[in-house]
Amino acid sequence: MKYVVLIYSNPATWRALPAEEADRVITVHNDLIDELTASGEFLSIYRLADPTNARTVALRDGVPAVTDGPFGESKEVLASLWEIDVESMERAVEIAGALTPHATVEVRALMDAAGMEM
């Protein structure tokens, strides 16, 4: 089954990490990517740029309204997403658990265009 692993983090928290801890987190992620690639479970990763450069688009009175950045109320923003192909939700959650020291991680099954889980 294919899953997406959504990693949310607070940019201020990330910037405040000591360099050694930031390096450790990056190493953990890179090592996990290598492990999942070797096992055939890793499909892709997308790291997202600084959210201050994002635009949020919402329909207001029938007209698209564009605002800078992500939703203002949110402290955590989507930082990256991984696409994986594993045997079960339990395995996807196991992988997500390795990514959580300074982030919130959400796991969702992917669906095809017909709405069937992949």
Residue ranges of each PLM-predicted region?
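Conserved, structured core segments of small domains
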Residues: M1-M118
